[in-house]
């Protein structure tokens, strides 16, 4: 490989790294909401999987503990799926054109 090509490749890699960092920082700010029980339990988290809020409708507080635990878990899992889908969408623009192996997800 010629010296000029190598320098260009290094610049491209550095730019990609900067874009990846910006995208990851943006994901830390994006919030998604998962819900269960028809919206009676809601979990809000960032796309970096930091839970920001858990909201439980007061009508559930006197209910069966096991059911409430199941609804919280379901709402959390719903939020997690939404966060992952949003992250993949955002990272797709950063990784567009990169020859990544099938099934490889970024960020690592």
UniProtKB/Swiss-Prot annotation:
Location of the region described as Disordered in the Swiss-Prot/TrEMBL record: 86-108
Biased composition (Pro residues): 99-108
Cytoplasm among keywords: yes
Alphabetical keyword list: Cytoplasm, DNA-binding
Domain of life: Bacteria
Cellular component aspect of the GO annotation: bacterial nucleoid; cytosol
Main location: cytoplasm
UniProt cross-references to InterPro entries, sorted A to Z: YbaB-like_sf, YbaB/EbfC
Gene3D superfamilies, sorted: Nucleoid-associated protein YbaB-like domain
One of the Pfam families matching this protein, by short name: YbaB_DNA_bd
GO molecular function: DNA binding
Subcellular location: Cytoplasm, Nucleoid
Family: Belongs to the YbaB/EbfC family.
Subunit structure: Homodimer.
Main function: Binds to DNA and alters its conformation. May be involved in regulation of gene expression, nucleoid organization and DNA protection.
HAMAP family the record matches: DNA_YbaB_EbfC
Protein name per the record: Nucleoid-associated protein BPP1222
